[in-house]
Amino acid sequence: MTYSTVSINTPPPYLTLACNEKLPTVLSIAGTDPSGGAGIEADVKTITAHRCYAMTCITALNAQTPVKVYSINNTPKEVVFQTLESNLKDMKCNVIKTGMLTAAAIEVLHEKLLQLGENRPKLVVDPVLVATSGSSLAGKDIVSLITEKVAPFADILTPNIPECYKLLGEERKVNGLQDIFQIAKDLAKITKCSNILVKGGHIPWNDEKEKYITDVLFLGAEQKFIIFKGNFVNTTHTHGTGCTLASAIASNLARGYSLPQSVYGGIEYVQNAVAIGCDVTKETVKDNGPINHVYAVEIPLEKMLSDECFTASDVIPKKPLKSAADKIPGGNFYEYLINHPKVKPHWDSYINHEFVKKVADGTLERKKFQFFIEQDYAYLVDYARVHCIAGSKAPCLEDMEKELVIVGGVRTEMGQHEKRLKEVFGVKDPDYFQKIKRGPALRAYSRYFNDVSRRGNWQELVASLTPCLMGYGEALTKMKGKVTAPEGSVYHEWCETYASSWYREAMDEGEKLLNHILETYPPEQLDTLVTIYAEVCELETNFWTAALEYE
């Protein structure tokens, strides 16, 4: 028998540049959730996702899933002692995070904190008293022990509303922020922990447009409240959010961030993990599914496979290429997108926007148009940056060159905005363009771009960039013959730009590019491109709406 030999270049050079990386360390003291969504398993995932080193001290072996807690089996006190003692003896520890605590674990931790004195690590206490599924995880004795023996050592306490009630020993009506402020102040007094984060996920609020949630951070030493307002995600899949948030805060503290920064970063991480979600439960589990802890984690093998220096193709052969274009009737992806049920409502509201009509007839207030030009100028900076990133991810030199040409065109468009602002609106300060303040609509758009840039591939970046190009042209094409703004006015000139023949040529190239990206995009993931296109059309609509509503 003849044997073949395959040589593989591993490890690649970029993995040998950082030797003995100094990772921040976080120790989680908590119970298990073998289904992986909460407890110590969620802690380890979260700590790792924040590029920190996770250590554990298991307080209870639980039989638990998102459905319910089936059983709780406490770890013997001597085992908890040995685990905590050995970890803190042999391992560095920047932050301790606690979750589900037993009476034995509290006694051991209390003694250790007293022993360490001023040398103890920072402490984040998530008073796990009630599971998201509604299961009680602690009796009155545990509540008292946490209050008396753990909370006074904590740098921050992170209860949700039901846990606040347990710690306070009473339920209260919560009708507004002042009620939450009072709860936080009372908790700080009872627990002797000066920093309290009251998590508001259990009580979404309503304003005129949408539901939202508020998390309130009380900084006792500064007598200050910081209110974090977040979008309410319409999902029941929130299993493990409390564990995850506390671990994210602990990880951020371990990385050297301040407490407010750490809380902000933790909240955003959890909101993203909830919004993105993950499909890991069986169909019988309708509620309280887990969140996506690893949404921002790279897959090492994918990074290796995309490396042109990778030589293990004999071991891992590339899959036969299937084209998503095969799923598009007529092969025109642009037409497919704008007529797709998920895209069409946002596309129609975008290209038929009242903003364009008011510019075309010259009735838009000057200050609103100036605001739009300023915001669009700042947007184009992001737009050019994403095209540069798209160029770096493009599969071939020709596609890279196209992205660079587009960036040059964007700079020309920015120059037109500079001219309008100087000649029409009297801008004279040379630093004016670097000082433009971004409005909420632009910030939302920019954050979306940042996310797609980090997580998306070349095709997904193209899908996110194309609605801007195509929508402006389509909107102004629909206004052909209807532009009544005086010739020579900034309004008329703006309309002429996007209705011009050269802009139509750019749109034709954009349409070709959309068809081109399908050639190498997996057909089973086509809905991802559809979703991106729909979401960006909605962002474009909101961008014009913001200009209309500017005061």
Swiss-Prot record:
Q: Explain what induces or represses this protein's expression.
A: By absence of thiamine.
Reaction(s) catalysed by this chain, per the record, are: 4-amino-5-hydroxymethyl-2-methylpyrimidine + ATP = 4-amino-2-methyl-5-(phosphooxymethyl)pyrimidine + ADP + H(+); 4-amino-2-methyl-5-(phosphooxymethyl)pyrimidine + ATP = 4-amino-2-methyl-5-(diphosphooxymethyl)pyrimidine + ADP; thiamine + H2O = 5-(2-hydroxyethyl)-4-methylthiazole + 4-amino-5-hydroxymethyl-2-methylpyrimidine + H(+)
What InterPro entries does the entry give?
Haem_Oase-like_multi-hlx, HMP/HMP-P_kinase_dom, PM/HMP-P_kinase-1, Ribokinase-like, Thiaminase-2/PQQC, Thiaminase_II
Query: What does UniProt give as GO cellular component?
Result: cytosol
Q: Which CDD domains match?
A: HMPP_kinase (cd01169), TenA_C_ScTHI20-like (cd19367)
GO function terms (MF aspect)? ATP binding; hydroxymethylpyrimidine kinase activity; phosphomethylpyrimidine kinase activity; thiaminase activity
Q: In which pathway does it act?
A: Cofactor biosynthesis; thiamine diphosphate biosynthesis; 4-amino-2-methyl-5-diphosphomethylpyrimidine from 5-amino-1-(5-phospho-D-ribosyl)imidazole: step 2/3; Cofactor biosynthesis; thiamine diphosphate biosynthesis; 4-amino-2-methyl-5-diphosphomethylpyrimidine from 5-amino-1-(5-phospho-D-ribosyl)imidazole: step 3/3
EC assignment: 2.7.1.49, 2.7.4.7, 3.5.99.2
Similarity section: In the N-terminal section; belongs to the ThiD family.
> Any idea what this protein is called?
Hydroxymethylpyrimidine/phosphomethylpyrimidine kinase THI20
The protein's organism comes out as Saccharomyces cerevisiae (strain ATCC 204508 / S288c) (Baker's yeast)
What gene is behind this protein? Answer: THI20
